[in-house]
Amino acid sequence: MRHLTRARGVAVAAASLLRATYHATEIILFGSTAQPERFHERSDVDLIAWGIDERAYVRAVADVNGLDSYMFVDLVRGEEASPRLLAVVAEEGSAL
């Protein structure tokens, strides 16, 4: 349970950073951190964000992963997401 609380805290901090620094317009948490019944000790934080300039994406990934050395953040630019991933996000995602 503490790991889930930590993961969600990282997700919220990452969303704040992405909005303030990279001008993200929409950020959605998906995957096991958004679905507590699927969460386990090896879960990471899956985020999809729109509005991040593609030239700043690598820096954004580094910054969100620097928030917590124990918790990996998988960041996807919404503009580059596959239709299949977008369907998963629409079904199980939670806006931040």
Q: What are the residue ranges of the model-derived segments?
A:
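Catalytic core of pol beta-like nucleotidyltransferases
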Residues: 1-26, 34-41, 50-96
